[in-house]
């Protein structure tokens, strides 16, 4: 019986020590209330010991995290309440509880409104300064903006609808918002970006980029390991990206510059333009024009626009090419060292033509000037190779020598 009481007593002591350990991991908070313009402001400051990870979880307000050289974690919480008496403002401030503690290898900063329905005039901002060598930042707010920079590890950020800004991140990053924009500077790892409707911009990513928006535009200036981009209707621009690039937009334009691999490009109705790609390109639009320059092979299809393709030897894989439009002209530029077989046709040849700078491409027609006439062309260049099929229902076809 005595031993049982000793065990119960020890358990009770441990139960008391655990919450004390959590509280003692951080210093006491300091609170100051003052008048700012037409509103009351409360400032809460505190610090925590340096650990590997930081989690910030708040039900309102923006979150700003900066990496620096200091040894610990310092935080400042600013809350504001609209025009009222000081007594009323202090009563509202007391409803918003901010707790900070360390548990294991993770520091926690939590903001929780505990007063029922929150007044519309109440707002807040969490500012945190951390050591640069943090392994993980996990930041979550139900509606405010998130801004993080200057850390060597990984960042995971989530907002119910605010904007996201990430820069100088050594590891990878995930960012998700219900509708705000996402702006990314430099990230050392992979990127997963999702917004319900805002725009997405990435300046440089050393890992693969996955970017998805319900309707905003997407711009990637530099990517090192490929990209998957999807937007419900906005435009897409990629300036430089190694690896495979896959783009889908419900109706916006697609503009790619220097792609270091294959590309799959699709738009519901916008134009597609590509400056160069080292791999096979598949481009499809419901009705816009397609321009693909500096590609080894391509499949291009449009419901009604024109197609221009420049075939070159890039050192990448060369496949058969298939170029087709419902009612536009098709122009194919061919570099001097490209070996291909050519097959071309125009369904409604009256008033249209096939022309070629190459004597090895032979052009013929069927029908007469008074009836339906079709045009065809075939031949081999440099001994033949992958087949290039070119077809338009109603338009002209041109085979031209590429100058460079």
Q: What is the predicted function of each stretch?
A:
Residues 1-404:
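Intrinsically disordered, low-complexity terminal regions
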């Amino acid at each position: 019986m005595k031993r049982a009481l000793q065990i119960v007593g020890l358990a009770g002591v441990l139960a008391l020590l655990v919450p004390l350990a959590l509280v003692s991991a951080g210093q006491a908070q300091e609170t100051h209330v003052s008048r700012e313009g037409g509103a009351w402001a409360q400032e809460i400051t505190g610090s925590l010991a340096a650990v590997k990870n930081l989690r910030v979880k708040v039900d309102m307000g923006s979150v700003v995290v900066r990496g620096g050289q200091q040894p610990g974690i310092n935080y400042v919480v600013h809350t504001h309440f609209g025009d009222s008496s000081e007594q009323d403002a202090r009563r509202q401030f007391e409803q918003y509880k901010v707790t900070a503690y360390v548990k294991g290898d993770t520091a926690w900063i939590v903001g929780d409104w505990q007063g029922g329905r929150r007044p519309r005039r109440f707002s807040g901002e969490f500012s945190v300064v951390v050591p640069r060598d943090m392994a993980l930042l996990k930041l979550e707010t139900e509606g405010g903006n998130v801004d993080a920079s200057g850390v060597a590890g990984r960042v995971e950020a989530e907002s119910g609808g605010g904007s996201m800004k990430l820069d100088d991140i050594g590891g990878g990053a995930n960012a998700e918002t219900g509708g705000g924009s996402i702006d990314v500077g430099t990230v050392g790892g992979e990127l997963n970006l999702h917004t319900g409707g805002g725009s997405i911009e990435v300046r440089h990513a050393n890992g693969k980029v996955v970017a998805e928006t319900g309707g905003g535009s997407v711009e990637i200036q530099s990517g090192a390991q490929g990209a998957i981009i999807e937007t419900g209707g906005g435009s897409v621009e990629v300036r430089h990206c190694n690896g495979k690039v896959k783009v889908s937009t419900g109706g916006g334009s697609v503009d790619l510059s220097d792609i270091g691999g294959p590309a799959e490009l699709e738009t519901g109705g916008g134009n597609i333009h590509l400056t160069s790609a080292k791999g096979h390109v598949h481009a499809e639009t419901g009705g816009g024009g397609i321009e693909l320059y500096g590609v080894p092979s391509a499949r291009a299809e449009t419901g009604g626009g024109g197609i221009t393709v420049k075939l070159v030897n890039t050192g990448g894989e060369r496949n058969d090419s298939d170029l087709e439009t419902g009612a536009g002209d098709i122009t194919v530029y061919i570099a001097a060292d490209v070996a291909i077989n050519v097959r071309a046709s125009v369904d409604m040849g009256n008033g249209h033509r096939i022309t070629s700078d190459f004597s090895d491409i032979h052009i013929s027609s069927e029908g007469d000037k008074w009836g339906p006439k079709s045009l065809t062309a075939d031949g081999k260049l440099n001994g033949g190779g992958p087949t290039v099929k070119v077809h338009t229902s109603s338009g002209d076809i041109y085979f031209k020598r590429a100058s460079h």
